Amino acid sequence: ALFCALATSSAFASQGTALLRQPDLSANQLAFVYGGDIWVSDKNGQNPRQLTSHPASEFAPKFSPDGKWIAFSASYDNNTDVYLMPSSGGAATRLTFHPSADTVNGWSPDGKKVIFASNREIANSRSNQLFSVHVEGGFEQKLMEAVAFEGDLSADGKKLAYRPNNMAYSGPSGWRLHRGGSTPPVWIIDLEKQQLEKIPHPNANEFSPFWLGDDVYFLSDRDNTAVNLF
């Protein structure tokens, strides 16, 4: 994702474009945010195309497993909700309608549900839980009762790798090399057996967990130099 984002950045360079954010990959495309809108390009970063154009901010694009759809969050109507649109472009469909902010996090492995984070059932506004909503709409379902800010489901949907703590501030990756009691770990929960596995956690920032086969990968600054993949 980083390489493709850099390639796209090079493609935009002749136009003086900067700050391409939140990249997500499908088999053939790269989605990213630029200027508060959702864009896609070829996987190699060429042929960028703008999918959304609205005064409100659109962010957190995530491809469906088959790459045909993009789920994203948007602040239309002065509220942040979950939306769905074809990855080739077209009209967006609103999936959530709650007054709390709903931020897209990913997809269920079968591509039938969008996973999002929300504080809708939390007394304070500084914590989130993970929910799912069907792509055809309907009532949202909570993945678990525990606080979670982001997570990724295993291929069979039985386990969730997630970050239970917020970052040191509300940005996407926290303060660089922050150390202290609030540094977030990555945990794995078996949703059927309700068994929790805590990945050994130094005093470091660890986030963005994802599954690759039976293994969980995540970003961490535990080597005290920069953020790397572990």
Question: Can you annotate each of these PLM segments?
Answer:
Residues 1-9:
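Bacterial N-terminal signal peptides
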Residues 14, 33-39, 53-58, 71-83, ...:
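A flexible loop/linker signature enriched in serine peptidases of the S9 family
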Residues 14-43:
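Beta-strand-rich domains and repeat architectures in extracellular enzymes and scaffolds
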Residues 25-27, 65-66, 109-110, 155-156, ...:
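Residue-level detector of Asp-centered blade-edge/turn motifs that repeat once per structural unit
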Residues 48:
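Glycine/alanine-rich phosphate-binding loops at beta-alpha junctions
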